[in-house]
Structure formats: C-alpha cells, structure tokens
C-alpha cells in the first residue's frame, strides 16, 4: 500500500472575515424567501458533491459573493489580499446543510426571486454556519500520530459528518430495488405475495411499472443539469407523486438538530404544486429504499396482510435477514467473484459444516476470505458524542450480536484454514473445498 499523507484544509468562516459584526442567523434569514433560498443552497450543495478533480470551490462561491452588497463582499476581498483563498475550503457540505436546516426553522413558504439583500443575508448566514462547523473539530489529527492515536483523534469528528461525506450512487439504489421487487420474489413465495398485494392495492399492473414510474422520473431530472435538485411531476403520475409525497418534509413541524434527523427522514420539500426539491441527494438515496418499504407496509396493512403496529418492524426484519444478508449479498458476491474464486454462501457452508459459519467464503489459490455481512446502525447520541471510548464500545457491542447461533465479530476473527474441513463422528473426513494441508492464510472481512 502506498504511503499516505494527511492533508488539512482551512475553512473560511464568519468570525475571521467579519470580526466586528454581530449578526444573528435567525434575524438574517427571517425575511429571505425560504423556498427560493433552499433551492439555491441545495443546488450549490449538489454542485459541490459533483465537483471534478481539479475544480475549485471558486466556481460555486464566486457567482454568489459577487451578487451581495459591498459591506458583505468587500471584507472578503480585503481578506483575500492577505491570504491565498486557493488554499481555503469555501463550500463545506455540512455547513450548507446547517444553512438549509436554519432556513427550515424560520420557513415562510415564499418563492420570490432573491434580491441583493437576500443573497447578502444568506451568505452571512452561511458564514455563521461555517463557524458552527469548525466548532465541531475538537481535536485535529496529525501525521506523527501512531495508528491508535490517529483513530482516536480522527474517528469521533469524522463520524459526525460521515453520512454527508460518504459517497452515494443512485445506480446502486436502482439495482437494489430491482433485485428486491423483481428478482427476489422469484425465489421467495412470501415476498412474492407481498409484492402482488402491493400492486393490487396501488392498482398498478406490475412491480416493474412501479420502478419505472419512480426512477425514470428521477433520472429525467438530471438530463439538462447533473446537479439539478428540482423535479416537476405531472399530476397524472399518481404513484410517483404518492411516493415522493411520502418523503416530503412539512416545514411547520421542523426542529433543528446537528444530525439533521428530520431532513434524513424526509429529504424533499415541496416548493410548488407537484414541484419537489431534493434538499440533499445523498439523504434521498439513503431514504428512498426505506421509503419504498414504508410504501409497501402501508399497502399491506390496508389489505390485512401485515399487523398495523409491528408491520414495518416485521417487514424490515424479514427483508434484512432473507433479502439483504442472504439473497442480495449472495447474488452480489457470486457475480463479483464467481468466475475467479472458489466460493460458497453461508447457507452452503452451514449445510456442509453446521451452524456458526460466516456469511460467505472465497478462496483464490492459497488465500481464504471469509465475509460477515452486517447492517449496523449507530444511535445519533452515540455518533455525535465525540467520545472515542463510547463509540468504540457501541461498535464492538453491535458487531457481537448473535445471528444464527454464533457471536458475529468475535467468532469471525478466530477462523483459520482448519475451520473448513468435514468431521464425521469426530474424525477427519476430508478438507472442505479440497484445501491442501499447508494452506494457512485466512482473512476475515466485515
């Protein structure tokens, strides 16, 4: 592995550019047209996410700052004469989301074009959000730290914005939804019944029709501009409207928090009749799959197939084990490694060797790779605690939950080449997958 070097970048913020100002963010945003402002900020945020290597934040930042009042842009110019802004981060994703969240807390539902004063106040509010963002960095890592020190310093702060910084790809979401609604029912009669009842309740011909309605509409949004966050849907597309309505936030009930929980739950906002704005595309991609499950749960409850109280929990639990950890994971591994590796699924291992096997087994030449697939969610209060020991303890506890008769995360670390051979009545009966006796390289992977 190549030697890597940690690089740090400075974020420009309100306190260094406007040391003599004392603006309050709620006063700055009180009269800014909320819908128009949210559309602008979410678009700039999308452009930041879609930046190419070599592009700089100037491309997003400059058109904005040039439309502000002199009392806003002149101090920036004076600061730029002293320091090279090319070394600064000018657009921060977390700070942009903070600004959207603040706009939602003082939402006024207005759609007028933004004036010079509006853009000025919006920029000042963003710079205040950059101060909030910087306050989250309690301890900065450096290149001289040992591995454990680096993790202890870096991970707590990194986790706070991990959902925002981690990459997402809508094409992967489409594949997962296709596997769920089209392929999985072919192998699972229980879920095939669920899909059939779902389609009947929605009065649609097939699951494929449903996917086409949702994802083709979504893809059309990006035909003209890949960073576009605004989508208009024809009122006759009832299923698409119903699906996106289920993911649309009601600003009158919004409460701000540093983890954006309500925005994650409802990542869209309506800025007009059948006009939807994706506040942050990554949040939508995280939520769309879960939103589809809520959609299905509601339909199945209406038809008496699922219990109204525990319907979603039961559906999620069933799909987590039968679809995510087995069918989808097995299919993914088989298609990625099936030609060049000896491979066996967890079910095949259990049939041959009994309970307590990993979820997947690969071998290439003299190397074994054993996989544990686990979908772990960490509570926001743990993730945002900033305490390394608290986070570490919760992570180890989550990875040691008991699935199918073994302690996951504990047992997987103890696998070695001798684990995979047959025993009959306690006696050696031949190595699983015909391993040679000298093979001793085994790598557990979560």
Predicted regions span which residues?
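A short acidic/basic microdomain associated with nuclease active sites
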Residues: 333-363
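Catalytic cores of nucleic-acid endonucleases
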Residues: 378-434
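Beta-sheet entry/capping signal
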Residues: 359, 366-370, 433-435, 444
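Active-site beta-strand-loop-beta-strand hairpin of nuclease catalytic cores
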Residues: 362-383
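Long amphipathic alpha-helical coiled-coil/heptad-repeat bundle
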Residues: 1-219
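Polybasic (Lys/Arg-rich)
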Residues: 267, 275, 437-446
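Flexible loop/turn segments at secondary-structure boundaries
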Residues: 351-356, 377-380, 441-445
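Interfaces and regulatory segments of ATP-dependent nucleotide/adenylate/phosphodiester-chemistry enzymes
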Residues: 122-337
């Amino acid at each position: 592995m190549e030697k890597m070097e940690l690089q740090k970048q400075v974020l420009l913020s309100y306190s260094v550019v406007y040391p003599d100002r004392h603006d309050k963010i709620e006063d700055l945003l009180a009269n800014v047209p909320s819908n128009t402002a949210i559309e602008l900020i979410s678009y700039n945020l999308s452009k930041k996410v879609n930046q190419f290597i070599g592009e700089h934040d100037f491309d997003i930042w400059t058109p904005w700052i040039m439309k502000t009042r002199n009392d806003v842009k002149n101090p920036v110019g004076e600061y730029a004469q002293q320091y090279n802004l090319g070394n600064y981060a000018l657009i921060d994703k977390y700070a942009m989301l903070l600004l959207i969240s603040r706009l939602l807390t003082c939402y006024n539902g207005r759609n007028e074009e933004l004036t010079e004063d509006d853009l000025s106040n919006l920029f000042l509010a963003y710079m205040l959000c950059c101060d909030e963002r910087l306050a989250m960095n309690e301890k900065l890592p450096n290149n001289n730290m040992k591995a454990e020190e680096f993790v202890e310093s870096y991970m707590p702060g990194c986790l706070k914005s991990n959902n925002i910084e981690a990459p997402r790809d809508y094409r992967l979401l489409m594949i997962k939804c296709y596997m769920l609604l089209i392929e999985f029912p072919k192998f699972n009669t229980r879920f095939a019944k669920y899909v059939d009842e779902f389609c009947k309740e929605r009065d649609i011909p097939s699951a494929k029709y449903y996917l086409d309605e949702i994802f083709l509409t979504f893809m059309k949004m990006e035909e003209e501009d890949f960073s576009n966050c605004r989508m208009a849907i024809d009122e006759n597309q009832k299923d698409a409207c119903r699906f996106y309505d289920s993911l649309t936030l009601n600003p009158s009930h919004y409460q701000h928090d540093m983890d954006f929980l309500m925005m994650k739950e409802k990542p869209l906002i309506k800025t007009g009749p059948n006009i939807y704005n994706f506040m942050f595309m990554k949040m939508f991609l995280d939520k769309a799959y879960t939103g589809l499950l809520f959609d299905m749960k509601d339909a199945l409850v209406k038809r008496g197939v699922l219990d109204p109280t525990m319907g979603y929990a039961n559906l999620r639990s069933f799909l987590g084990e039968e679809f995510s950890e087995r069918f989808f994971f097995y299919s993914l591994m088989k298609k990625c490694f099936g030609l060049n590796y000896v491979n066996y699924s967890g079910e095949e291992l259990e049939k041959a060797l009994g309970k307590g096997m990993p979820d997947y087994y690969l071998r290439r030449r003299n190397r074994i790779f054993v996989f544990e697939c686990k979908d772990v969610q960490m509570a926001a209060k743990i993730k945002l605690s900033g305490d390394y020991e608290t986070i570490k303890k919760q992570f180890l506890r989550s990875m040691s939950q008991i699935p199918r008769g073994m302690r996951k995360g504990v047992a997987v670390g103890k696998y070695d080449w001798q684990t995979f051979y047959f025993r009959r009545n306690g006696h050696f009966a031949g190595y699983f997958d015909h391993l040679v006796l000298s093979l001793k390289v085994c790598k557990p992977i979560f």
